[in-house]
UniProtKB/Swiss-Prot annotation:
Membrane-spanning intervals of the chain: 333-353
Free-text function comment from the UniProt entry: May serve as a multifunctional regulator for innate immune signaling pathways.
SUPFAM superfamilies recorded: B-box zinc-binding domain, RING/U-box
Segments forming a coiled coil: 163-247
Location in the cell: Endoplasmic reticulum membrane
Source organism phylogeny: Eukaryota, Metazoa, Chordata, Craniata, Vertebrata
Matching InterPro entries: Znf-RING_euk, Znf_B-box, Znf_RING, Znf_RING/FYVE/PHD, Znf_RING_CS
Superkingdom classification of source: Eukaryota
Protein name in UniProt: Tripartite motif-containing protein 59
Main location as per UniProt: endoplasmic reticulum
CDD domains named among the record's database cross-references: Bbox2_TRIM59_C-XI, RING-HC_TRIM59_C-V
Residues in B box-type zinc fingers: 92-134
Membrane topology label: Single-pass membrane protein
PROSITE patterns: ZF_BBOX, ZF_RING_1, ZF_RING_2
């Protein structure tokens, strides 16, 4: 607090003097503060004298206050004038209370550890709290600054530093793990994408090849029939022109020529068109095999050899509906094919165990036998898948039945 401001502060309320009155001992106090002291003293007195004795709060000397009270005490006009002038001046360097207008913060509250004004102590929320003057509080806190430094440099803060380093290390480890996992994910899906792209190109190449075979199969027949059709149209046009011929000799010669050409044209052998189909169907393969294969096993799926084969006859008109029934699918399985394939697999396994089969032997197998095995393999896979579906369906039905009887 400014030294000049301290001289203008009441020692009872620690605020700027309000209506300053002078005691006989020459000490000045606020009139309201003196009335409070007199009221407190009169509460302990059993009689009311003509003059009220009062102990000065500063010098502790006994002074007498007239019976009329503090109103009869002289006003310190000089001090009052100085205070009024002081209040009119700008004191931006002096801290003032935020709750009490223009009251300086000139007292230190020991309970709340903060600066307060005189009104805070008398009528505010700090009333009755232990206090100290600013200079004394400053000296005490200055002496305890060493303890503050000790509190800020004890083992607790070393533990905080160690914990920070430990957390940073754990954070770095976790981030490293995440980065490694990211690399694994990228590599995994890159490899998976390459595998799928390779399988895609292989299947598309196989379909392009079968498309070429389709052209070779049908295009010659179509061209041959087109020529026959063109010759037919030519003969029809020739016949129309002959009908306009008026010379009997010329007409007969031309008609005979037309008959011979028609006979020769009709005697030409027409191509024997047998219904064929593409087998196996890639769409069915993707649906029945690929969609049920684990991702990691896709690279192990064999690419089928797509061919044009004679179209198989349907056993009934509702064969497509019957294929959807698990029981009839199971009955449709060819026991002879399954037995034959199992026998071949066992024989190959025995021969491989006894003596590895050389690549020369494998390559010496005729092409038609290899195709036959491929055809049987596709049928076998389809039959086995149908069998598994039926078994799973039966097991699920049994589990639902038992679940309704015996609670799990």
């Amino acid at each position: 607090m400014h030294q000049f401001e301290e001289e203008l502060t009441c020692s009872i309320c620690y605020s700027l003097f309000e209506d300053p009155r002078v005691l006989p001992c020459s000490h000045t106090f606020c009139r309201s503060c003196l009335e409070g002291v007199i009221q407190l003293s009169s509460n302990f007195s059993i009689w009311r004298p003509l003059r009220v004795p009062l102990k000065c709060p500063n010098c502790r000397s006994i002074v007498e206050i007239p019976a009329s009270g503090t109103e009869s005490l002289p006003i310190n006009f000089a001090l009052k004038a100085i205070i009024e002038k002081y209040r009119q001046e700008d004191h931006s360097d002096v801290a003032t209370c935020s709750e009490h207008y223009r009251q300086p913060l000139n007292v230190y509250c020991l309970l709340d550890k903060k600066l307060v004004c005189g009104h805070c102590l008398t009528i505010g929320k700090h009333n009755g709290h232990p206090i100290d003057d600013l200079h004394s509080a400053y000296l005490k806190e200055k002496e305890s600054s060493g303890k503050i430094l000790e509190q800020l440099t004890d083992k607790h803060w070393s533990d905080v530093c160690l914990l920070i380093e430990k957390l940073k290390e754990q954070k770095a480890q976790c981030e490293s793990i995440v980065q490694d996992d990211k690399k694994v994910v990228v590599q995994y899906f890159k490899k998976l994408s390459e595998t799928l792209e390779h399988k895609k190109q292989v299947l598309l190449a196989a379909l392009d090849e079968i498309n070429r075979q389709i052209l070779e199969e049908y295009e010659p027949h179509i061209e041959k029939l087109k020529k026959i059709r063109e010759e037919q149209l030519e003969l029809m046009s020739l016949n129309t022109s002959i009908q306009k011929e008026e010379s009997p000799l010329v007409f007969l010669e031309k008609v005979d020529n037309v008959h011979q050409r028609i006979k020769a044209l009709k005697e030409k052998e027409l191509p024997d068109v047998k219904p064929v189909e593409v087998y196996p169907r890639v769409g069915h393969l993707l649906k029945d095999v690929w969609s049920k294969t684990e991702i990691g096993q896709i690279n192990k799926i064999l690419t089928p050899k797509i061919k044009l084969v004679p179209k198989r006859k349907l056993h009934s008109k509702n064969s497509e509906k019957e294929r959807g029934k698990p029981e009839e699918l199971l009955q449709a399985a060819n026991p002879l094919s399954v037995t034959f394939i199992f026998t071949v697999i066992i024989a190959i396994a025995v021969l491989s165990f006894h003596k590895p089969i050389s690549s020369v032997v494998i390559e010496s197998i005729p092409t038609h036998i290899s195709d036959f095995f491929g055809f049987l393999y596709q049928d076998f896979c389809t039959c086995m898948q149908n069998t598994v579906d039926v078994v799973c369906h039966k097991l699920n039905s049994l589990a639902e039945f038992l679940g309704g009887i015996v609670p799990f």
